[in-house]
Curated annotation (Swiss-Prot):
InterPro entries: Ig_E-set (IPR014756), IRK_C (IPR041647), K_chnl_dom (IPR013099), K_chnl_inward-rec_Kir (IPR016449), K_chnl_inward-rec_Kir_cyto (IPR013518). Changing residue 38 to F: Decreases channel activity. Pfam families: Ion_trans_2, IRK_C. One of its GO terms (molecular function) is inward rectifier potassium channel activity. One of its GO terms (biological process) is regulation of monoatomic ion transmembrane transport. Changing residue 78 to P: Increased channel conductance. This is Inward rectifier potassium channel Kirbac3.1. The lineage of its organism: Bacteria, Pseudomonadati, Pseudomonadota, Alphaproteobacteria, Rhodospirillales. Inward rectifier potassium channel that mediates potassium uptake into the cell. Inward rectifier potassium channels are characterized by a greater tendency to allow potassium to flow into the cell rather than out of it. The inward rectification may be achieved by the blockage of outward current by cytoplasmic divalent metal ions and polyamines. Complements an E.coli mutant that is defective in K(+) uptake. PANTHER family: INWARD RECTIFIER POTASSIUM CHANNEL, INWARDLY RECTIFYING POTASSIUM CHANNEL 1, ISOFORM F. It comes from Paramagnetospirillum magnetotacticum (Aquaspirillum magnetotacticum). It is a multi-pass membrane protein. Residues 70-82 are extracellular.
Amino acid sequence: MTGGMKPPARKPRILNSDGSSNITRLGLEKRGWLDDHYHDLLTVSWPVFITLITGLYLVTNALFALAYLACGDVIENARPGSFTDAFFFSVQTMATIGYGKLIPIGPLANTLVTLEALCGMLGLAVAASLIYARFTRPTAGVLFSSRMVISDFEGKPTLMMRLANLRIEQIIEADVHLVLVRSEISQEGMVFRRFHDLTLTRSRSPIFSLSWTVMHPIDHHSPIYGETDETLRNSHSEFLVLFTGHHEAFAQNVHARHAYSCDEIIWGGHFVDVFTTLPDGRRALDLGKFHEIAQ
């Protein structure tokens, strides 16, 4: 910091723990939900997605049922004016089930049947493609430690966090980047957020199969050299971890991210060893101790 100026002592974190932005966007033109519907349907949660698909399916069938009723008695063997019979006829038509008891009568009803069959095919194609796209998106399956620690390693203060591979399959050519994000003041007195890439003792692993302790030595080249817990908080410092690699099961690149605030840094702590020896002599990775920190 320069000129003795400091930002306010406390602010909400800029990055959520999953690495996503915690910034509210203002001044944008109001965007309707359907303006970017493909992205929205890919990113909403599964319960919301299933609810939307089910709701759209029921509403569409209900609308066609009302259309059949508006045409009069155009469904053979259906009870006159029965919305239930018209609705289930619509379901059978949209799904091309065709049990044979309920039959459209006349050109108007058959026109509606043709239109509904087309809507059913298009709807099935869209729903199936969305479900396939959601299911086939590769995920890294990487676990990040809930805390970072700053303690001595080989006689030098070191910022450390660790991650673990939750799957049996290996991740090839794994890369980790650790970035410091903090508020700084320019020579003109403007407060801005600056990103500092932190040098790691090892930022790449040819094979990532178990756990990995990521370490940044705090020497005179480090952006956090000489910093204390108080000064890091005053600059609203946050640490963003970015992980990328090629997953052998998916045969695709995967990525993961995690962010830490100053509240999630343990000064003077060290991670508990997660490797143990079983009674038969085999080595094991105990993920139950993954987040444990000793002083």
